Amino acid sequence: MWTIREATADDLPAIAKIEAQVYTVEGPWSLADFQTDYALPDRYYLVAEDEGRIIGYAAAFAENDTVDLTMNTVLPEYRKQGIGTQFLIKRLEWAGNRKVVLQTRMDNTTVQQMYAKYGFKPTQVLEDFYPNAVAALEMVREHLTESLPE
Protein backbone atom coordinates (compact mmCIF):
# COMPACT_ATOMS: atom_id res chain seq x y z
CA MET A 1 0.00 0.00 0.00
CA TRP A 2 1.30 3.42 -0.86
CA THR A 3 2.02 6.24 1.56
CA ILE A 4 2.70 9.95 1.16
CA ARG A 5 5.47 11.86 2.89
CA GLU A 6 7.41 15.08 2.52
CA ALA A 7 10.23 14.68 0.01
CA THR A 8 13.92 15.05 0.81
CA ALA A 9 16.80 16.04 -1.45
CA ASP A 10 17.67 12.33 -1.68
CA ASP A 11 14.33 11.73 -3.46
CA LEU A 12 15.09 14.12 -6.33
CA PRO A 13 16.78 11.55 -8.63
CA ALA A 14 13.70 9.30 -8.41
CA ILE A 15 11.43 12.30 -9.00
CA ALA A 16 13.44 13.27 -12.10
CA LYS A 17 13.22 9.68 -13.35
CA ILE A 18 9.41 9.70 -13.05
CA GLU A 19 9.31 13.08 -14.78
CA ALA A 20 11.30 11.65 -17.72
CA GLN A 21 9.03 8.59 -17.92
CA VAL A 22 5.75 10.52 -17.85
CA TYR A 23 6.60 13.66 -19.83
CA THR A 24 8.41 12.22 -22.83
CA VAL A 25 6.93 14.69 -25.33
CA GLU A 26 6.49 17.80 -23.21
CA GLY A 27 10.09 18.44 -22.24
CA PRO A 28 10.68 16.94 -18.80
CA TRP A 29 12.58 18.72 -16.07
CA SER A 30 16.11 17.45 -15.47
CA LEU A 31 17.54 16.44 -12.11
CA ALA A 32 19.35 19.80 -12.03
CA ASP A 33 16.02 21.60 -12.58
CA PHE A 34 14.50 19.78 -9.61
CA GLN A 35 17.56 20.41 -7.43
CA THR A 36 17.46 24.13 -8.21
CA ASP A 37 13.71 24.40 -7.53
CA TYR A 38 13.84 22.28 -4.36
CA ALA A 39 16.55 24.53 -2.88
CA LEU A 40 14.45 27.68 -3.24
CA PRO A 41 12.69 29.06 -0.15
CA ASP A 42 9.03 28.26 0.53
CA ARG A 43 9.00 25.09 -1.58
CA TYR A 44 6.99 22.04 -0.53
CA TYR A 45 7.62 18.67 -2.18
CA LEU A 46 5.76 15.42 -1.50
CA VAL A 47 6.36 11.89 -2.72
CA ALA A 48 4.14 8.83 -2.82
CA GLU A 49 5.90 5.56 -2.05
CA ASP A 50 4.93 1.94 -2.49
CA GLU A 51 7.18 -0.45 -0.57
CA GLY A 52 10.09 2.00 -0.74
CA ARG A 53 9.65 2.83 -4.44
CA ILE A 54 8.72 6.41 -5.30
CA ILE A 55 5.65 6.29 -7.54
CA GLY A 56 4.64 9.94 -7.70
CA TYR A 57 5.44 13.46 -6.59
CA ALA A 58 3.77 16.81 -6.08
CA ALA A 59 5.05 20.29 -5.33
CA ALA A 60 3.94 23.75 -4.35
CA PHE A 61 5.50 27.07 -3.51
CA ALA A 62 4.36 30.02 -1.43
CA GLU A 63 4.77 33.65 -2.35
CA ASN A 64 3.29 36.22 0.01
CA ASP A 65 -0.30 35.15 0.70
CA THR A 66 -0.61 32.83 -2.32
CA VAL A 67 0.38 29.20 -2.81
CA ASP A 68 0.90 27.83 -6.33
CA LEU A 69 0.42 24.09 -6.84
CA THR A 70 3.05 23.38 -9.47
CA MET A 71 3.40 19.64 -10.03
CA ASN A 72 1.26 16.56 -9.54
CA THR A 73 2.58 13.43 -11.24
CA VAL A 74 1.83 9.75 -10.58
CA LEU A 75 3.13 6.76 -12.54
CA PRO A 76 0.40 5.49 -14.90
CA GLU A 77 0.05 2.11 -13.18
CA TYR A 78 -0.76 3.85 -9.86
CA ARG A 79 -3.33 6.34 -11.14
CA LYS A 80 -6.98 6.34 -10.05
CA GLN A 81 -6.06 5.14 -6.55
CA GLY A 82 -6.49 8.49 -4.77
CA ILE A 83 -2.84 9.52 -4.74
CA GLY A 84 -3.49 12.78 -6.60
CA THR A 85 -6.31 13.62 -4.22
CA GLN A 86 -4.07 13.00 -1.21
CA PHE A 87 -1.35 15.16 -2.77
CA LEU A 88 -3.94 17.92 -3.15
CA ILE A 89 -5.21 17.61 0.43
CA LYS A 90 -1.68 17.67 1.91
CA ARG A 91 -0.77 20.76 -0.11
CA LEU A 92 -4.01 22.52 0.88
CA GLU A 93 -3.22 21.77 4.52
CA TRP A 94 0.27 23.23 3.99
CA ALA A 95 -1.27 26.31 2.35
CA GLY A 96 -3.38 27.01 5.42
CA ASN A 97 -5.75 29.90 4.79
CA ARG A 98 -3.77 31.35 1.88
CA LYS A 99 -5.16 31.69 -1.62
CA VAL A 100 -4.20 28.69 -3.80
CA VAL A 101 -3.63 28.80 -7.58
CA LEU A 102 -3.03 25.97 -10.04
CA GLN A 103 -2.93 25.32 -13.76
CA THR A 104 -4.14 22.19 -15.50
CA ARG A 105 -4.42 21.11 -19.11
CA MET A 106 -7.64 22.31 -20.73
CA ASP A 107 -8.48 18.77 -21.82
CA ASN A 108 -8.05 17.27 -18.33
CA THR A 109 -11.68 17.63 -17.26
CA THR A 110 -11.48 14.77 -14.75
CA VAL A 111 -8.90 16.55 -12.61
CA GLN A 112 -10.72 19.86 -13.05
CA GLN A 113 -13.81 18.25 -11.49
CA MET A 114 -11.71 17.04 -8.55
CA TYR A 115 -10.30 20.52 -8.03
CA ALA A 116 -13.82 22.00 -8.16
CA LYS A 117 -14.85 19.60 -5.38
CA TYR A 118 -12.15 21.20 -3.23
CA GLY A 119 -13.32 24.75 -3.86
CA PHE A 120 -11.31 25.72 -6.95
CA LYS A 121 -12.97 27.91 -9.55
CA PRO A 122 -11.77 28.51 -13.13
CA THR A 123 -10.37 32.00 -13.62
CA GLN A 124 -8.74 32.12 -17.05
CA VAL A 125 -7.47 30.16 -20.03
CA LEU A 126 -3.71 30.40 -20.56
CA GLU A 127 -2.97 29.83 -24.24
CA ASP A 128 0.30 28.05 -25.10
CA PHE A 129 1.00 27.41 -21.40
CA TYR A 130 2.42 23.92 -21.92
CA PRO A 131 4.83 22.75 -24.64
CA ASN A 132 3.37 22.05 -28.07
CA ALA A 133 0.97 25.01 -27.75
CA VAL A 134 -1.27 23.26 -25.21
CA ALA A 135 -3.57 25.59 -23.29
CA ALA A 136 -4.09 25.48 -19.53
CA LEU A 137 -7.02 26.35 -17.34
CA GLU A 138 -6.04 28.39 -14.30
CA MET A 139 -8.09 27.62 -11.21
CA VAL A 140 -8.10 29.47 -7.89
CA ARG A 141 -9.24 28.65 -4.40
CA GLU A 142 -9.64 31.80 -2.35
CA HIS A 143 -8.59 31.98 1.28
CA LEU A 144 -9.70 28.89 3.16
CA THR A 145 -12.95 29.48 5.00
CA GLU A 146 -14.33 25.96 5.25
CA SER A 147 -13.03 22.49 6.01
CA LEU A 148 -11.86 20.14 3.28
CA PRO A 149 -14.41 17.66 1.89
CA GLU A 150 -14.14 14.08 3.07
PLM-predicted stretches and their roles:
Residues V74, K80-E93, T109, Q113-K117:
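Conserved acetyl-CoA-binding loop-helix of GNAT-fold acetyltransferases
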Residues L148-E150:
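Intrinsically disordered, low-complexity acidic/proline-/asparagine-rich linker or regulatory tail/stalk regions
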Residues Q35-T36, N108, P131-N132:
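Short secondary-structure capping/turn micro-motifs that flank functional sites
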Residues G52, G56, G82-G84, G119:
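Conserved phosphate-binding and hydrolysis motifs of nucleotide-dependent enzymes
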Residues V101-T104, A116, K121-E138:
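Conserved catalytic-core motifs of GNAT/GCN5-like acyltransferases
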Residues A60, N64-T66, K99, V134-A136:
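A generic structural signal for beta-strand entry/edge sites
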Residues W2, E6, D10-E77, L88-K90, ...:
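Acetyl-CoA-dependent GNAT
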Residues W94-M106:
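Conserved GNAT acetyl-CoA-binding A-motif
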